[in-house]
Amino acid sequence: AIPVVLHGFNSPDHLWRGLQWMSAMGSAAALVAALRAMPPERSRATRAVLVGVLLAALVPIAWHGVLQVWQQHPAMVEEFLQHRPEILAARGWPEGSPQALTYERRLMQPEATAWFGLSNVASSAFAAGALAFAGAAIALRRVRPASAFLLALVAAVSGLLVIVNGSKGALLALLAGTVFAVWCAWRAPSARTCVRIATTFVVLVLVAVLVRGWIGERWSERSLLFRSHYVTAATQIVIEHPWFGVGPAGFGESYLVARPDRSPEEVQSAHAAWADWLASMGVCGTAWIVLFGALVALAAHGAAAAPSPGARGVSGDAVTASVPPRIGSFAWSRGPIIAAVVVLAASLVAIVPEFDSLDDATLLMRVLAALFAASIAGATVRAVLIGGRAWAAGIAGAVLLLAMHGQVEMTLWWPGSVGRTVALIAVGAAFAMPRSTCDRWSPVMATFAACALLVPATIGVIGAQRAHAAEAVVARAAQPLAAFGLARLHIAPAPNTSLASARMQAALLLLEHSTNPWLDRPAVVAVGLQQLASAVSVVPPEDANWPAKAIELANHALDTHHYESVAASAALVAEALDAANVRGMKGVTKAAIDSLLQRAAQCQVSINPRSVRGWARLANVAEAQGDSAASSSAALRALAADDSFALDPLRKLPAFERANLQRQASDK
């Protein structure tokens, strides 16, 4: 975690992502150590409550996914089709451009992303929930058949959402986890055999990625091929930054330079936990790899653990149907209530940030989903307390599929999922860690792990203060623009000011401010420049000083931010000014506009040598200046970069743009 802290001092992007990684891995170690340090009965009860909370939290997520697929997605597509030109223009994407085609392709796919934002990451959670809830339903089926039915229903819905999302990796991981769970429950293998099988499954995923890279384009499959590209680039990044890596948020920019020549994608993650950790933290990332591997192995070990003892007089075969010996114990009577209250409170608190945007019907459904999640939490706790082979195999299979999918997807990289995923894996591992009577080190380790969590907590509190101040500025910048959106939806009257004025106000708030690293993040600066480009595209401008101010702000952004997103957005400002200049705009010279465009494009290609748009801009500027040799050279680079995207045809240039580049390349 040392590299995370070091990189965090340099950039808030490294800080907020890295702190979540640190918290997730530190909490995993603390959970396992603390559960091992507890007396057996208390540890068992605590595990049950933790599992109940972690799994039941999936219910509101699954509910949201169902709404997205069958209600929100059709409405979103209809809205896009009705306002397609305006939406594309607001993003600066010409009709038929690679960006527009890629955006439309993703928009038309019905996906249950819930609050994760990524369908493949959400599919990891749904798949794990499907398998774990199925094991819990089997464990509870004879004691509480009604509760078992509800658990089975949630398992079925979760599995259906995985199918709807169409995530091949999640489906294969779910299949592997199910096979492993069924085999463990049916054959009752030894613990060593379970660990070997689980390890083999995870290693096979890594081997599949490497073999797919070796096969190359001789096979039409693309998903694993792209994963092999990510791993190849990650290896190059580790070689160049072996000690402390490039930081939790540094992979994206590094990938632009290190990616293979035929890789058409620009990604922020290696889509493999081990590669992400090594690229982000260098050799220090091996500590997390070892910890994660140990947790997965322990969870597999737990699949072979002896089932919980049944009630007196109940045979071992019926253990899943029996009530624990202390049916009136605190764990059995109070554990479900504790888990239900925690889940209910968390689900209701999660509504607060969205409260103002929810109508009455949606709000009622959110509350009902929270109540249903609370009931699922209580049922899950009782299933875990009953235990048995089915439950032990189910949770071990869920951990295995998470570990497998984490080697080909961003499940263990994405901040919204890493904490939940690692916590479930840690609790699954804790089932295989009974405490011996002479164990004196577990309490010490638990205390040390808990104290270590104070480091990310302290840094997080300090960073949250500046983040809160930056959030207030962003909210002020967005407020005038939101008024126009509400007016378009006929929810509020149209504002008295113009849209261009609102965009300029937002740009000034985001680009001119006192020192705050959270407002100087590339994503915020890029958005500010995009709003600036839209504001100055209006002729005549509302303020004669706007064009000159736009040149100044764009150049300042290029001075302080060496990121492709910022360079591309600065180029949009120059192009907007150039188009406005043709229509008679006054205030800046053509030479100043061309200078900004050339500088932004040069910055763009220096960061991303395969930026088609950057090379095309350089070709256009050189042609306008009468430098045919430079124009031809840049056009040839643009055409070569465009050819390298053959694996993703939608990213290739439209025919008319490519024809223009070919003309420029031939003019020497």
Give short role names for the model-derived ranges.
Residues 73-77, 118, 228-268, 274-288:
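TM-adjacent membrane-interface loops and short helices in multi-pass inner/ER membrane proteins
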Residues 69-70, 211-225, 453-482:
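Hydrophobic alpha-helical transmembrane segments in integral membrane proteins
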Residues 1-8, 15-214, 273-310, 317-319, ...:
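Alpha-helical transmembrane segments of multi-pass inner-membrane proteins
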Residues 84-88, 225-236, 472-488:
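Short extracytoplasmic/periplasmic juxtamembrane "stem" segments immediately C-terminal to an N-terminal membrane anchor
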Residues 104-108, 226, 230, 247, ...:
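Juxtamembrane loop-helix boundary motifs flanking transmembrane segments in multi-pass membrane proteins
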Residues 312, 356-359, 582-588:
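Intrinsically disordered, low-complexity Ser/Thr- and acidic-rich flexible linkers and loops
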Residues 433-445:
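Flexible interhelical linker loops that connect adjacent transmembrane helices
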Residues 475-668:
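C-terminal luminal/periplasmic domains and tails of membrane-associated envelope-modifying transferases
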